[in-house]
A protein has these predicted regions:
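Cap/lid segment of the alpha/beta-hydrolase catalytic domain
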Residues: 1-80, 133-138
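Mobile cap/lid helix-loop segments that gate and shape the active-site cleft of serine hydrolases
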Residues: 58-69, 76-82, 96, 119-160, ...
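Active-site loop->helix "elbow" adjoining a glycine-rich segment at hydrolase catalytic centers
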Residues: 71, 103-106
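Short glycine-enriched nucleophile-adjacent loop
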Residues: 86, 106-117
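Alpha/beta-hydrolase fold nucleophile elbow
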Residues: 86, 90-103
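Short beta-strand/loop motif that positions the catalytic acidic residue
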Residues: 162, 169-171
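Acidic catalytic loop of the alpha/beta-hydrolase fold
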Residues: 173-178, 213-214
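C-terminal catalytic histidine-bearing segment of alpha/beta-hydrolase fold enzymes
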Residues: 188, 194-229
Length: 229
């Protein structure tokens, strides 16, 4: 399955068709928030074909480290401020705020749910595996890395903070960035945590054929079953 470069826009429409209000974030380093430095200051000068001009997260991540922060932390702040904005609209049911993210967006949603209790459920696509199987052994965007994280926890261990909120994980069996064995190991650990929290029925893993990309039909269908609508 080829990377669907328009999945964010279509996710908006999918959510609205299901009766949800939808807000899409322009993530730092992407789209209108991409790196706008002159070309001679950027990595493309070494290999013009090495970087998608619309995905420029590396420099922002490095500058965040220079400032004693992380790009992931900055993105979490953006997401929390977006929820603040949603909460200012009286027609929004703040008891039913959910996050849907694919790849880096899914990673962001997972970490954000650990510090943002207003996120009441998650759909994560193409992002769920152990550190060792994914970012520890396969080249990834540098903003996926948290300094020192593995000293304290692995990616699925964060379920201890997220549970018992509804969780749907949708992965491709042939995703080169998140190998299947690492996905299955991670989900077993997360599910065990949900079981310990008395919420085994509130998490689900869906494995699809193909590689890296979002699967809306499977994702939304499973999520509707978990949240009842």
């Amino acid at each position: 399955m080829e990377l669907d470069r328009h999945f964010i826009e279509r996710n908006d429409f999918q959510a609205v068709r299901r009766g949800y209000a939808a807000l899409t974030l322009e993530i730092r380093g992407f789209g209108e928030r991409r790196d706008r430095r002159p070309a001679e200051a950027r990595e493309e000068r070494f290999d013009p074909d090495s970087i998608d001009p619309n995905v420029t997260c590396k420099h922002a991540a490095m500058v965040a480290l220079l400032l004693g922060r992380t790009s992931l932390g900055e993105k979490i702040l953006d997401l929390r401020r977006a929820i603040d904005t949603l909460a200012s609209f009286p027609e929004i049911d703040t008891g039913r705020v959910y996050a849907v993210g694919n790849s880096g967006g899914g990673t962001l949603a997972w970490y954000a749910a650990c510090v943002e209790p207003r996120l009441r459920g998650l759909i994560l696509g193409s992002c769920f595996a152990t550190y060792a199987a994914s970012i520890g052994s396969v080249d990834h965007c540098c903003d996926n890395y948290l300094p020192g994280a593995l000293r304290w926890f692995d990616f699925p261990d964060l379920a201890a903070v997220v549970a018992p909120r509804p969780l749907v994980v949708v992965m491709g069996r042939a995703d080169p960035l998140f190998p299947l064995a690492g996905v299955e190991t991670a989900y077993r650990r997360a599910r065990a945590i949900y079981e310990a929290a008395g919420a085994a029925g509130r998490c689900r893993l869906i494995l699809c054929e193909g590689g890296h990309g979002f699967r809306p039909r499977e994702a939304w269908g499973a999520f509707a079953e978990l949240v009842g609508g």
